[in-house]
Amino acid sequence: MTGRLALLLGASLVASSLFWVQRCAAAESGGGPIVRIAELEIDPGQLEAYKLALKEEIETSIRVEPGVLTLYAVSVKEHPEQIRLFETYRDASAYESHLQSPHFKTYKDRTRQMVKLLRLVETEPILLGSKSR
């Protein structure tokens, strides 16, 4: 191995180590990303109204809240009334801010009678990756 290659390899190892130390420290301090999964069952007779309210809430949250990183809504195949939300927040503070936002409170009030079942799943992020569109 040449000296130059060894130096490059060493620098890469140091940079990788620093990256992982920072990631671990952020996770331990609670400063890492928060990922939530919500499982909902919507009253089939109100499904279209629910989708409209959800669309408005997601679009507003993404536009005005810098700590809201992703909000994805999907339905279970062949069961459109079963909705799954995948939410990623910059950190716990961003999640709490989202819960207190006027648009989220409006969404909750507006959809309260539409939601038959809500189950929140706490997660522990392992690896989060995405690609720019």
Predicted regions span which residues?
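Short amphipathic alpha-helices within nucleic acid-binding modules
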Residues: 48, 52, 90-100
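Acidic/polar helix N-cap motif
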Residues: 43-46, 79, 91
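Mature N-terminal segment immediately following signal peptide/propeptide cleavage
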Residues: 34-51
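Short, flexible helix/strand-to-coil boundary loops that buttress conserved ligand/catalytic motifs
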Residues: 54, 98-99, 108-111
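Short hydrophobic/aromatic beta-strand micro-patches
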Residues: 39-41, 74, 86-88
